[in-house]
Protein backbone atom coordinates (compact mmCIF):
# COMPACT_ATOMS: atom_id res chain seq x y z
CA UNK A 1 0.00 0.00 0.00
CA UNK A 2 1.03 3.57 -0.65
CA UNK A 3 -0.97 6.21 1.23
CA UNK A 4 -0.83 9.65 -0.38
CA UNK A 5 -2.77 12.89 -0.52
CA UNK A 6 -5.27 12.53 -3.35
CA UNK A 7 -8.04 14.82 -4.50
CA UNK A 8 -8.94 16.08 -7.97
CA UNK A 9 -6.87 19.15 -7.18
CA UNK A 10 -3.89 17.38 -5.65
CA UNK A 11 -2.76 14.04 -6.97
CA UNK A 12 0.42 12.58 -8.39
CA UNK A 13 -0.43 11.05 -11.77
CA UNK A 14 3.08 9.69 -12.28
CA UNK A 15 3.03 8.02 -8.87
CA UNK A 16 -0.36 6.45 -9.56
CA UNK A 17 0.96 5.01 -12.84
CA UNK A 18 4.11 3.68 -11.16
CA UNK A 19 2.09 2.04 -8.38
CA UNK A 20 -0.30 0.46 -10.87
CA UNK A 21 2.61 -0.92 -12.92
CA UNK A 22 4.07 -2.53 -9.79
CA UNK A 23 0.81 -3.82 -8.34
CA UNK A 24 0.91 -1.38 -5.40
CA UNK A 25 -2.50 -0.27 -4.14
CA UNK A 26 -2.90 3.48 -3.57
CA UNK A 27 -4.85 4.70 -0.55
CA UNK A 28 -5.86 8.32 -1.05
CA UNK A 29 -6.35 10.57 1.95
CA UNK A 30 -8.03 14.00 1.81
CA UNK A 31 -10.21 13.22 -1.24
CA UNK A 32 -12.11 16.47 -0.58
CA UNK A 33 -8.96 18.58 -0.48
CA UNK A 34 -7.25 19.90 2.62
CA UNK A 35 -9.93 22.35 3.66
CA UNK A 36 -8.96 22.39 7.36
CA UNK A 37 -6.11 24.76 6.49
CA UNK A 38 -8.48 27.47 5.33
CA UNK A 39 -10.18 27.66 8.70
CA UNK A 40 -6.95 28.44 10.53
CA UNK A 41 -4.68 29.88 7.82
CA UNK A 42 -6.85 31.34 5.03
CA UNK A 43 -4.03 33.49 3.66
CA UNK A 44 -1.80 30.47 3.04
CA UNK A 45 -4.13 28.07 1.26
CA UNK A 46 -2.69 27.78 -2.26
CA UNK A 47 -6.04 27.40 -4.07
CA UNK A 48 -8.85 29.84 -4.80
CA UNK A 49 -11.33 27.70 -2.85
CA UNK A 50 -10.28 25.98 0.35
CA UNK A 51 -12.05 22.75 -0.46
CA UNK A 52 -12.40 20.85 -3.69
CA UNK A 53 -16.06 20.53 -2.68
CA UNK A 54 -16.47 24.27 -3.39
CA UNK A 55 -15.11 24.01 -6.94
CA UNK A 56 -17.58 24.75 -9.77
CA UNK A 57 -16.32 21.87 -11.92
CA UNK A 58 -16.78 19.40 -9.07
CA UNK A 59 -20.30 20.74 -8.48
CA UNK A 60 -21.15 20.40 -12.19
CA UNK A 61 -19.82 16.84 -12.40
CA UNK A 62 -21.71 15.92 -9.23
CA UNK A 63 -24.95 17.35 -10.60
CA UNK A 64 -24.51 15.40 -13.85
CA UNK A 65 -23.77 12.19 -11.94
CA UNK A 66 -26.70 12.70 -9.56
CA UNK A 67 -24.56 12.82 -6.46
CA UNK A 68 -22.99 15.23 -3.99
CA UNK A 69 -19.60 16.86 -4.62
CA UNK A 70 -18.14 14.66 -1.86
CA UNK A 71 -19.45 11.53 -3.55
CA UNK A 72 -18.05 12.73 -6.90
CA UNK A 73 -14.59 13.13 -5.33
CA UNK A 74 -14.72 9.63 -3.85
CA UNK A 75 -15.97 8.18 -7.16
CA UNK A 76 -13.17 10.04 -8.99
CA UNK A 77 -10.51 8.51 -6.72
CA UNK A 78 -11.98 5.05 -7.23
CA UNK A 79 -12.03 5.61 -11.00
CA UNK A 80 -8.30 6.40 -10.74
CA UNK A 81 -7.78 2.99 -9.11
CA UNK A 82 -7.29 4.28 -5.57
CA UNK A 83 -9.02 3.46 -2.30
CA UNK A 84 -10.08 6.85 -0.94
CA UNK A 85 -10.30 7.38 2.81
CA UNK A 86 -12.48 10.45 3.39
CA UNK A 87 -13.05 11.78 6.88
CA UNK A 88 -16.28 12.97 8.36
CA UNK A 89 -17.59 13.23 11.89
CA UNK A 90 -21.18 13.44 10.65
CA UNK A 91 -22.83 9.98 10.56
CA UNK A 92 -25.13 10.94 7.66
CA UNK A 93 -22.19 12.09 5.56
CA UNK A 94 -20.41 8.82 6.28
CA UNK A 95 -23.51 6.90 5.12
CA UNK A 96 -23.82 9.09 2.00
CA UNK A 97 -20.18 8.47 1.13
CA UNK A 98 -20.64 4.73 1.62
CA UNK A 99 -23.68 4.77 -0.69
CA UNK A 100 -21.57 6.16 -3.49
CA UNK A 101 -19.49 2.97 -3.55
CA UNK A 102 -22.31 1.25 -5.45
CA UNK A 103 -24.46 4.14 -6.65
CA UNK A 104 -22.03 6.58 -8.30
CA UNK A 105 -20.01 5.93 -11.43
CA UNK A 106 -18.38 8.76 -13.35
CA UNK A 107 -17.99 8.77 -17.11
CA UNK A 108 -14.53 9.00 -18.67
CA UNK A 109 -15.33 12.61 -19.61
CA UNK A 110 -16.28 13.47 -16.03
CA UNK A 111 -13.09 11.88 -14.70
CA UNK A 112 -11.06 13.85 -17.26
CA UNK A 113 -12.76 17.12 -16.23
CA UNK A 114 -11.88 16.46 -12.60
CA UNK A 115 -8.35 15.46 -13.63
CA UNK A 116 -8.00 18.91 -15.21
CA UNK A 117 -8.26 20.50 -11.75
CA UNK A 118 -4.81 19.14 -10.87
CA UNK A 119 -2.52 21.72 -9.31
CA UNK A 120 1.15 20.96 -8.56
CA UNK A 121 0.94 22.60 -5.14
CA UNK A 122 0.32 20.34 -2.16
CA UNK A 123 -2.27 21.04 0.50
CA UNK A 124 0.39 21.10 3.17
CA UNK A 125 3.80 22.47 2.24
CA UNK A 126 6.86 22.85 4.44
CA UNK A 127 6.97 26.61 3.85
CA UNK A 128 3.33 26.98 4.87
CA UNK A 129 3.81 24.83 7.94
CA UNK A 130 6.88 26.79 9.01
CA UNK A 131 5.27 30.17 8.39
CA UNK A 132 2.12 29.19 10.22
CA UNK A 133 4.27 27.87 13.07
CA UNK A 134 2.72 24.42 12.91
CA UNK A 135 6.27 23.15 13.13
CA UNK A 136 9.35 24.98 14.34
CA UNK A 137 11.46 24.70 11.20
CA UNK A 138 11.24 23.50 7.60
CA UNK A 139 14.09 21.14 8.57
CA UNK A 140 11.39 18.93 10.12
CA UNK A 141 9.73 18.45 6.75
CA UNK A 142 10.49 15.15 5.08
CA UNK A 143 13.32 15.29 2.55
CA UNK A 144 13.60 12.25 0.25
CA UNK A 145 17.30 12.91 -0.52
Short names for language-model regions:
Residues 1-145:
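Beta/alpha (TIM)-barrel catalytic core signal, keyed to glycine-rich beta->alpha loops juxtaposed to Asp/Glu
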Amino acid sequence: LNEVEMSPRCYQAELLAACEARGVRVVGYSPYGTCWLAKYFPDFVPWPAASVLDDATVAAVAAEAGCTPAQACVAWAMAKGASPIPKSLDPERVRATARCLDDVALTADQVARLDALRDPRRGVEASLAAHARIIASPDYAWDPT
